[in-house]
Amino acid sequence: MNVYYEQDADLGYLQGKNIAVLGYGSQGHAHALNLKESGLNVCVGLRPESASCAKAREAGLEVNTVAEATKWADIVMVLLPDQNQKAVYDAEIAPNLVAGNTLAFGHGFNIHYKQIIPAESINVIMIAPKSPGHLVRRTFTEGNGVPCLIAVHQDATGEAKQQALAWAKALGGTKAGVIETSIKNETETDLFGEQAVLCGGSAELIKAGFETLVEAGYPEELAYFECMHELKLIVDLYYEGGLSRMNYSVSDTAEYGGMTRGPRLITPAVKAEMKKILEEVQDGRFAKEFIDECNGGYKNLNKLREENSGHAIEKVGAKLRDMMSWLIKK
């Protein structure tokens, strides 16, 4: 696996080019501002009615429609929600691309699952910071950066990889390390991680633990602290030094209990289900299901959102978080 740093990337591959960042959400604002402050010529492409137009202009960025920004640009970074990209690409991006342009993405979903199929005369690259946008922005302003993944899907000009590395450098990523991968590997591992561990697995584990304690007669407040609130303390230890750092930092009681009881929860049957989830990502079944869900008006997703928001852990959690003066209230 190739890892690149400051000396491996040259901003010259982006200097003098017009760069459009489509979208101004979590990642979009970080990409646009970091590239602008790296001395590059950037504009933001948004719907005219978007509330983000005013925010981008207030930050000193030029704002145009998606079509206008694409037509003006040599390099176009698509940072719109996955489910919106195909329609916007077909209507406003593709008609305004010309041979030799570069089309960039922050995630490979639409390229990998062939929702978007660019012309062969276009460079297609991916630059994916492995952090939320606010952290991409904050570390840049502090003179640092976050690790990034890059991939080249199509190299029409012979400069696609150099452009991807230069973009990662302009984000600050080469100060932390830039890993070269493929669209396929980024997409499939990202989706699996979200579903089986980060967003799906962890949420269900938290709820099951909370419910087990409450059903046994313990106060909801204690159940919340033990199964939700304190999870951050453990994850921070993982983040800083891996599993060993966590085991070293907790009590012997916690370490022994975790090592002997944890495998009783995450059994071979659970791992077998993980493999099924991965297969659904790999063969496109999840992508088709998600696209159909979006096209159908999010009926199942909205139902699931309502069920989750009504869970007891959400209600007691909101009450307890109001008592935590150190939390930034939003």
UniProtKB/Swiss-Prot annotation:
It is an enzyme of class 1 (oxidoreductase). Residues 182-327 form the KARI C-terminal knotted domain. Mg(2+) 1 binds at residues 190, 194. One of its GO terms (cellular component) is cytosol. Its cofactor is Mg(2+). Binds 2 magnesium ions per subunit. This is Ketol-acid reductoisomerase (NADP(+)). It comes from Pelodictyon phaeoclathratiforme (strain DSM 5477 / BU-1). GO terms for biological process: isoleucine biosynthetic process; L-valine biosynthetic process.
